[in-house]
A protein has these predicted regions:
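Negatively charged, low-complexity tracts enriched in Asp/Glu with abundant Ser/Thr
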Residues: 3-64
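Amphipathic, interaction-prone secondary-structure segments
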Residues: 45-103
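A cross-kingdom feature marking charged/low-complexity
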Residues: 73, 132-141
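A short, surface-exposed interaction/processing loop segment used at functional sites
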Residues: 97-132
Length: 141
């Protein structure tokens, strides 16, 4: 049994959190769709009008439910290929010993498979002013 789930099967989060995750997914998928070239041959489309790799990306995007502090977002979760970390979302507020406070919903870039980068949040899913790419949360500027 996989520890990865789709958004609709995610438990332990309220509707506001899940709605914010839905908005985040849409932004990620829009970024991937802009990245993909126009469909003009090659593999046949699974979904009419969609590039097959875009469909595959959407269908294999999932959530790792095993973390205590963070929700890990993964690509390739349900496919036969490699699974990669897209990023992390903070589950509850905490303050690091350095004084940086992280809030519920903060987007965190991956520092590795099990660890988010804790130098600064890249945005918050409850605010509308964050930017993401299909490869992960944006770098700091």
């Amino acid at each position: 049994m996989s520890k990865y789930v789709k958004l609709n099967d995610l438990t332990g989060f309220d509707e506001e959190f899940k709605n914010a995750l839905g908005e985040l997914e849409q932004r990620i998928f829009e970024s991937y769709n802009k990245f993909m070239p126009a469909k003009d041959g090659g593999r046949p489309s699974i979904v009419e009008g969609e590039h097959p790799m875009f469909t595959e990306f959407k269908e294999n995007f999932g959530y790792d439910t095993g973390g205590r502090k963070y929700l890990r977002l993964v690509t390739g979760a349900f496919g036969e290929g490699q699974t990669s970390v897209w990023g992390f979302i903070n589950k509850k507020e905490f303050t690091k010993s350095s004084g940086i406070t992280f809030k519920e919903g903060d987007l965190l870039k991956s520092a590795g498979w099990n660890t988010p980068a804790l130098n600064k949040p890249r945005g918050n899913i409850f605010n509308d002013d964050y930017k993401v790419n299909w490869t992960g949360p944006n770098y700091l500027r």
